[in-house]
Swiss-Prot record:
The gene is glkA. The lineage of its organism: Eukaryota, Amoebozoa, Evosea, Eumycetozoa, Dictyostelia. The keyword Membrane does not apply. Belongs to the protein kinase superfamily. CMGC Ser/Thr protein kinase family. GSK-3 subfamily. Residues 1-84, 389-418, 437-473 are annotated as: Disordered. PROSITE patterns: PROTEIN_KINASE_ATP, PROTEIN_KINASE_DOM, PROTEIN_KINASE_TYR. ATP binds at V97, G98, Q99, G100, T101, F102, G103, K104, V105, K119. It comes from Dictyostelium discoideum. The keyword Ligase does not apply. This is Probable serine/threonine-protein kinase glkA.
Length: 473
């Protein structure tokens, strides 16, 4: 597994946005934090006093002090200690292999000398409990399996340790090394779809599907990882729109929709499929506006009905030239036209009309997939030997970062294709931006149809809020 070591890793998804619903719950229920955690309604700004009094949260997981740190998990329990040599009983730390927004990732070995990955995150973090709760109910061969969870005291901080199987490679590192055959793409995409089908059946939305979060064994067995952004979506609850890595972000998120569905994951896996086909991201936007512009350049201009279906954060019209779709032109080198047809059913502005995961699995492109044929492919052999004769575990990513290290997806990581928190202010595109982006204009209904900006600017989608898209978690 690989993890980007990007300096912008902490400025990824706007995790500090306010959630009014959760604020109300926290004000009224300071003594009932158990209920809030079990219902996935935590707020990132809960004060430390509440956190310190919340020692029996996370579905009755029992924690103990550092002097007696017996821990419990769904699968095993042990005593956790920390010393100057990073050794966490019964796991021996081998080395740090990555660092993400919320924690560090270590390669370790257990008492049976089996390699595992340990993701260490500070306990006070808002997303910790949700990630662990979701991991406990996810049980599928193509989803990352949690082996253990325990707490340690380190540098006067309470750390949550999540233990996973160690899986050495990512789809990002594979795409950096070689072009994939169409049949191997089918097998990988089929496995990814099975993982998505499983989590969507539980109303879980992953919300950050990227090549770096797709792990691969040496045989090509696929595992969906990094559930740090995952959430169980409820129809009567809003969620933050500033989520998901930019290249793989659905258009409804780009216009500030806060009542989205699991169809945002469908868009993401469509981007993954296209990237496997052409060897690079299909929509490599430089910021949120450029991202939307690049999508429009390929798919054509959204209709008025499309805009309404995407539920933008504020009522506005999108005024731009009548851009004809260039979708088939973008994929003209792809010989298998069934996969192009499948992508045309995924890349649809209206989330309701976008293909469901069941429709994707039933599509002719995946009709004859033989999941037991992995041994017939040689794509994974590119990792077998490096120049020094050792197994090559560290590679660069074509889609996410300029520098990567092992175990990307275990940390809630960030990369160059993710925007910073300050980018909620929608700014003017650079001169290198594509034409369709530079012609986007927001028109506020209260402005009597007058453009709120010059033609070479992309103004806020929320003019009444000084350009800031208000998000909820």
């Amino acid at each position: 597994m690989t993890i980007p070591t990007d300096n912008n890793s902490s400025n990824n998804k706007g995790y500090n946005d306010n959630n009014n619903n959760n604020n109300n719950n926290n004000n009224n229920n300071n003594n009932n934090n158990n209920n809030n955690n079990n219902n996935n309604k935590e707020h990132p700004n809960i004060n430390n006093n509440n956190n310190n009094n919340n020692n029996n949260n996370n579905n009755n997981i029992k924690e103990s002090s550092s002097s007696n740190s017996n821990h419990s998990s769904s699968q095993s329990s042990s005593t956790a200690t920390v010393n100057s040599n990073p050794k966490v009983y019964p796991y021996e730390i081998i080395k740090q292999v990555g660092q993400g927004t919320f924690g560090k990732v270590y390669e370790a070995k257990n008492q049976d000398n089996k390699r595992v990955a340990i993701k260490k995150v500070e306990k006070s973090n808002h997303f910790i409990s949700r990630e662990y709760d979701i991991l406990k109910i996810v049980a599928h061969p193509n989803c990352l399996r949690i082996l253990d969870m325990f707490y340690t005291a380190e540098d006067n901080k309470k750390m949550q340790n999540l233990v996973f199987d160690f899986i050495p490679y990512t789809l990002a590192s594979l795409l950096k090394k070689r072009q994939l055959s169409i049949n191997f793409i089918k097998v990988l995409f089929y496995q990814l779809c099975q993982a998505i089908k499983h989590i969507h059946s539980k109303a879980i939305c992953h919300r950050d599907i990227t090549p770096n979060n797709i792990l691969l064994s040496s045989k090509g067995e696929l595992t969906l990882a990094d559930f740090g952004s995952a959430k169980i979506l409820e129809s009567n609850h809003t969620s933050m729109s500033y989520i998901c890595s930019r290249y793989y972000r659905a258009p409804e998120l780009l216009v500030g929709c806060s009542n989205y569905t699991t169809k945002i994951d469908i868009w993401s896996i469509g981007c993954i499929l296209a990237e496997m086909l052409i060897g690079k991201p299909l929509f490599p936007g430089t910021n949120s506006n450029d991202q939307l512009g690049r999508i429009i350049e390929v798919l054509g201009s959204p209709t008025k009905d499309d805009m309404e279906a995407m539920k933008p954060s504020k009522p506005y019209h999108l005024q731009l030239p009548n851009i004809n779709p260039k979708f088939f032109e973008s994929l003209h080198n792809v010989e298998d036209k069934t996969v192009v047809d499948l992508l045309s059913k995924i890349f649809i502005f209206d989330p309701v009309k976008r293909a469901s995961i069941d429709e994707i699995i039933a599509h002719p492109f995946l009709r004859d997939v033989n999941i037991n044929s992995l041994e017939l492919f040689d794509e994974m052999k590119c990792f077998s030997v490096s120049g020094n004769g050792k197994s090559s575990l560290t590679t660069n990513s074509t889609s996410s970062s300029s520098t990567t290290a092992n175990m990307t997806s275990l940390a809630s990581s960030s990369s160059n294709n993710k925007t910073t928190c300050s980018e909620t202010y929608l700014s003017r595109l650079p001169t290198s931006a594509i034409t369709s982006s530079s012609n986007l204009k927001s028109i506020d209904n209260s402005n009597n149809g007058k453009s709120s900006s010059s033609s070479n600017n992309i103004p806020s989608l929320n003019n009444s809020n000084n350009g800031v898209i208000t998000n909820t978690i």
